[in-house]
Amino acid sequence: MNAVPDGRSDKPRSVVGVLALQGDTREHLAALTEAGAEAVTVRRLRELEAVDALVIPGGESTAMSHLLREFELLEPLRARLAEGMPAYGSCAGMILLATEILDAGAAGREATPLKGIDMSVRRNAFGRQVDSFEGDIPFVGLDSPVHAVFIRAPWVERIGDGVEVLARADGHIVAVRQGRMLATAFHPEVTGDRRVHKLFVDMVSE
């Protein structure tokens, strides 16, 4: 662990990285800090090696896959996930954490699965940008619904053994957990509700 002391208590804060190649990095950094983590950006291998956990933000999954290869992070990230590093993916991050990506993109520019969570995820399943929507949905483990913002959002079409469904929207799976990995099809980082990030920070400390 690379946890750092928390001045408010004797309990060290987990160092949680946010993959900062593309996507809404700043919003996740703010949410993680408010949830009690030491939040840092990750763009290089040495930065990936220094964190206790990683958030893969929303953005464009094919662009992120390309940049992971360009920055020589794809295989090291896969290896850290296989070793058990906690990870949270929102929207595009959910897509990349899957073992299988449906409608992965044009040949040569496909989104590449990191194989962190045993699930099949369909890209842009809820539609294009103009089909983006938001609403309140129940979330397992939280005492009241979360306000979920869906932007060109995916959904989960298959889950493996050991994957827990945490939320659904319109009958589709939109949040899951497997061990210390978490994924949501929506963007809790943009709403001001920090409960999903707090759930992840608590998972990192387990």
From Swiss-Prot:
Its EC number is 4.3.3.6, 3.5.1.2. One of its GO terms (biological process) is glutamine catabolic process. L-glutamine binds at residues 59-61, 123, 151-152. It holds the Pfam family SNO. InterPro entries: Class_I_gatase-like (IPR029062), PdxT/SNO (IPR002161), PdxT/SNO_CS (IPR021196). The keyword Hydrolase applies. Pathway: Cofactor biosynthesis; pyridoxal 5'-phosphate biosynthesis. Keywords: Glutamine amidotransferase, Hydrolase, Lyase, Pyridoxal phosphate. The active site is at residues 91, 187, 189. GO terms for molecular function: glutaminase activity; pyridoxal 5'-phosphate synthase (glutamine hydrolysing) activity. It catalyses: aldehydo-D-ribose 5-phosphate + D-glyceraldehyde 3-phosphate + L-glutamine = pyridoxal 5'-phosphate + L-glutamate + phosphate + 3 H2O + H(+); L-glutamine + H2O = L-glutamate + NH4(+). GO terms for cellular component: cytosol; glutaminase complex. The keyword Nucleotide-binding does not apply. Catalyzes the hydrolysis of glutamine to glutamate and ammonia as part of the biosynthesis of pyridoxal 5'-phosphate. The resulting ammonia molecule is channeled to the active site of PdxS. In the presence of PdxS, forms a dodecamer of heterodimers. Only shows activity in the heterodimer. Belongs to the glutaminase PdxT/SNO family. This is Pyridoxal 5'-phosphate synthase subunit PdxT. The gene is pdxT.
